[in-house]
Amino acid sequence: MASSAVIKLACAVLLCIVVAAPYAEAGITCGMVSSKLAPCIGYLKGGPLGGGCCGGIKALNAAAATTPDRKTACNCLKSAANAIKGINYGKAAGLPGMCGVHIPYAISPSTNCNAVH
């Protein structure tokens, strides 16, 4: 229960990272988004950056190569963000850069997923 909420929180924070990813190998699912971003939840709620967080962010960035994948990831992240309380969106906005991933927009739960390309 708490793990599910934590996973959803991380997904919301990394919404924009996945949305703008340039490379992919397979279709994105909400389960994939949740599992890859689960290690980031503690950090987004004020704790230390977990060891697997950046690896998950990079993997999702690489997997979201197509517009449909990026839109799916975006919607998964927004759903997760709405389900988890206590996310520090300032930390979320800085997380991609900390992990060496560049995204051309701000991370926000209000991102219009239909406008993602």
UniProtKB/Swiss-Prot annotation:
Pfam families per record: Tryp_alpha_amyl
KW 4Fe-4S (keyword) present: no
Gene3D superfamilies for the chain: Plant lipid-transfer and hydrophobic proteins
Signal peptide residue numbers: 1-26
GO-annotated biological processes: lipid transport
Sample GO molecular function, one term: lipid binding
Bridged cysteine pairs (disulfide): C30-C76, C40-C53, C54-C99, C74-C113
Keywords (A to Z) from UniProt: Disulfide bond, Lipid-binding, Signal, Transport
Role this protein plays: Plant non-specific lipid-transfer proteins transfer phospholipids as well as galactolipids across membranes. May play a role in wax or cutin deposition in the cell walls of expanding epidermal cells and certain secretory tissues.
Family according to the record: Belongs to the plant LTP family.
Name of the protein this chain belongs to: Non-specific lipid-transfer protein
Species: Spinacia oleracea
Lineage: Eukaryota, Viridiplantae, Streptophyta, Embryophyta, Tracheophyta
